[in-house]
Amino acid sequence: MTRLTQSDTWQALSTHTQSLPHMRDLFEGDAQRFKTMSTSACGLFLDYSKNRATEETLSLLFKLAEDAQLQSKIAGMFNGEIINTTEKRAVLHTALRASPEQEILLDGVNIVQEVQETQQKMAEFVNAITSGQWKGYTGKRITDVVSIGIGGSFLGPKIVSQALRPYWTGELNCHFVANVDATSICEKLKTLDAETTLFIMSSKSFGTQETLTNTLSAKDWFLKQGGSQLDVAKHFVAVTSNVPKATEFGIDAENIFPMWDWVGGRYSLWSAIGLPIALLIGMDNFKALLQGAHEMDKHFLEAPLTENMPVIMGLFSLLYGNFHGAQSHVVLTYDHYLRGLPAYFQQLDMESNGKSVTLDGTDVDFSTGPVIWGGEGTNGQHAYHQLIHQGTALIPADFIMPLQSHNPLGEHHIQLASNCFGQTQALMQGRNYDEALNELSGSKLSADEQALIAKHKVMPGNKPSNTILMDKLTPSTLGSLIALYEHRTFVQGAIWDINSFDQWGVELGKSLGNDVLERLSADSDATSLDSSSNGLINMFRQGKI
C-alpha cells in the first residue's frame, strides 16, 4: 500500500463515504446548503452543494489536502521549484500571466522580464499584421492565418479563439491544422490565397513530426502558388526554441518567438503559442485573458483551502474517483462558444494525471486521472445524458454557463438556463418509484402496466454535479475558468503524489511511430515485430486489404 492509502484520513474517508445520506435528504435537512456550499472568485461562481458531501466529508477532504502538504506544494510551483522531477524542470506557466512588476527568478534570471519582452514583440507583430503594415510577397495585406501545431500548441489556441469569437476584430480569418492526415491541411489550403496567407509554425524543437510535415507541405504549396524561397520570410513565422532550424527553413530570425522548458505544451496558450488568439482578438483582449488567469493564480496561492475554488473542485473529483468508483467526469458547457472546452480539459487532465507511479516510483494502489469528456448543452440532453441519469456508472458532472448571452435572441437564453439548472436538479433529486407511479395514475394503462413502466421511469438521483456561472463570457472570465481547471488538475496530482507535468506515454508513442515509419518505407516486408504489427504494416505497403 502507498502512504496515501495507509493514512488515517484516507481510511476515515473510506469508511465515511459508505454511509452518506442521499443528496435529496441533505437538501431537505438544510435550507442553507446552497449558501454554505458555494463560493465566488475571479468573476466565477461555483455551486458545489449538489455533491455527496456533509460537513464531515468536507472536513476529511481538507484534512487529506493538509496531510499532503498541498499549500506547500502550491507555493513550490509558483516559486519555481523543480516539481517536474523526471525531466528536472520547473513548472512556471503561471509566470506567463504574472504582473509586470513581479520578479520570478529561475537560475538567477527574472523570467517575468523575458515574458514581458515577448509580449511586447507579440504586440508589435499583431499591430503590423492587423494594420496592414505587414505585406505579403505581392504587396497585399494578410487576410488569413494558418496555425500549425499539435497537442497544446494546437488545441489551446483553437479552443480559446473559438470561445472568444465575439471579440474577434474582424481583420483576419484563422485556420488551425494539427493532424498529419493530409486531408486536414489540403482542405484548408483549397480555400486560401498564397499572396494573403500567413503560416505560424509552433514547435519547441522545430522537429515535431506532424507539425514539421504539415509546415513543409504548406511551404511546398506556397512555392507552387508563385512564392519564392526569399518570400517565405513574409509568409511564415515560428514559435520555437530552435532558432537555427527555423532560419534554415527560411523564417526571419526577427519573426521567431521563444518557447521555454518551464512551460509544458498543455499550459502554453498563455505564451507566444497564443499568437493566433492575439491576432484574432487584439493584444488588449489577449492581456485581459492573461489577467483573468492571473487573478485565479492569486486566488489559488492565497485563499484558505476551505475557500479555494480549484482545491474544492479537485478534492471532489478525487472523492468520486477514489471513494465512489467513478471512472469518468463529464464537462457540460451551456454556451455554444464554449463547446470546445471539454476537449481542452480532456487533454489538460488526462495527459497530466494519467499516471500509475508516485514520485518515488511506487506503483499506485488507487485510481488516478479519470476519463474527461463532454459537450455542449442542450445537445447532450438528447444523447449521453441518459447514461448519466440512469446508467450504472457514476459520472460526476460540471455544468458551465454565463448568465448573460452575447446573442440575446428572444427566449433562447432563458430556455438554455432552464435546461441547465433543471438537469442539475434532476441528477441530484432523481425520481423514486412512488413518484413515477403517481405520474402514470389516470393514464389508460392497466395497473400492471403502470407498475412495470414506473420501474423504467425510476431515476436514482444522488448524481453529483458542480455548477460554474459567470456574468458573461469575456477574455477575463475565460482566463479565470481555464486557470481554475489547470489548478484543479494540480490539486489531484499533488495529493496523489504523482508527476502531473511529464507525459512519457506520449513520448513512447512518438518513438514507436518513428520506428514503424521506417518499416513502412522499407524495401521489404516487416518481419521482426509482433505478428499484428507486421501484418498491418505489410497490408499498408500493399495498399489494399
UniProtKB/Swiss-Prot annotation:
EC number: 5.3.1.9
Gene3D superfamilies found in the cross-reference section: 1.10.1390.10, Glucose-6-phosphate isomerase like protein, domain 1 (3.40.50.10490)
Annotated localization: Cytoplasm
First-listed, main subcellular location of the protein, grouped into a coarse class: cytoplasm
Xref: InterPro entries: G6P_Isomerase (IPR001672), G6P_Isomerase_C (IPR023096), Phosphoglucose_isomerase_CS (IPR018189), SIS_dom_sf (IPR046348), SIS_PGI_1 (IPR035476), SIS_PGI_2 (IPR035482)
Any matching Pfam family: PGI
Enzyme class at the top of the EC tree: isomerase
GO biological process terms, semicolon-separated: gluconeogenesis; glucose 6-phosphate metabolic process; glycolytic process
GO cellular component: cytosol
MF term (GO), any: carbohydrate derivative binding
Catalytic residues as annotated in Swiss-Prot or TrEMBL: E351, H382, K510
PROSITE patterns per record: P_GLUCOSE_ISOMERASE_1, P_GLUCOSE_ISOMERASE_2, P_GLUCOSE_ISOMERASE_3
Keyword vocabulary terms for this entry: Cytoplasm, Gluconeogenesis, Glycolysis, Isomerase
Pathway linked to the protein: Carbohydrate biosynthesis; gluconeogenesis; Carbohydrate degradation; glycolysis; D-glyceraldehyde 3-phosphate and glycerone phosphate from D-glucose: step 2/4
Catalytic activity: alpha-D-glucose 6-phosphate = beta-D-fructose 6-phosphate
SUPFAM superfamilies, per database record: SIS domain
NCBIfam families attached to this UniProt entry: PRK00179.1
Function of the protein: Catalyzes the reversible isomerization of glucose-6-phosphate to fructose-6-phosphate.
Alphabetized PANTHER family for the sequence: GLUCOSE-6-PHOSPHATE ISOMERASE
Annotated family: Belongs to the GPI family.
Name assigned to this protein: Glucose-6-phosphate isomerase
Gene from which this protein is expressed: pgi
